[in-house]
């Protein structure tokens, strides 16, 4: 319940612009969120490994 409430709270427009922050759309994690995907690093990695993100490939050099 607490995580659901925090997701709703983060979705609201803050009174002051600097108070806004991103949350992972999948798990609700507040830190390490990639804005382009709207996912945290953990969810992004899992989904990329499963091939659920088109155009995202594992890089090697």
From Swiss-Prot:
Protein name, per record: Small ribosomal subunit protein uS14
GO biological process: translation
Cofactor annotation: Zn(2+)
Pfam families per the UniProt record, alphabetical: Ribosomal_S14
SUPFAM superfamilies (UniProt xref): Glucocorticoid receptor-like (DNA-binding domain) (SSF57716)
Binding locations of Zn(2+): 24, 27, 40, 43
The keyword RNA-binding belongs to this UniProt entry's keyword annotation: yes
Superkingdom in the source lineage: Bacteria
Cofactor detail note: Binds 1 zinc ion per subunit.
Protein family (similarity comment): Belongs to the universal ribosomal protein uS14 family. Zinc-binding uS14 subfamily.
Organism: Nocardioides sp. (strain ATCC BAA-499 / JS614)
One GO MF term attached to the UniProt entry: structural constituent of ribosome
Quaternary organization: Part of the 30S ribosomal subunit. Contacts proteins S3 and S10.
């Amino acid at each position: 319940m607490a995580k659901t409430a925090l997701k709703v709270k983060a979705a609201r427009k803050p009174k002051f612009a600097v108070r806004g922050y991103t949350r992972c759309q999948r798990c609700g994690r507040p830190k390490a969120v990639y804005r382009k995907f709207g996912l945290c690093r953990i969810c992004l990695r899992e989904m990329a490994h499963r091939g659920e993100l088109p155009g995202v490939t594992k890089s090697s050099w």
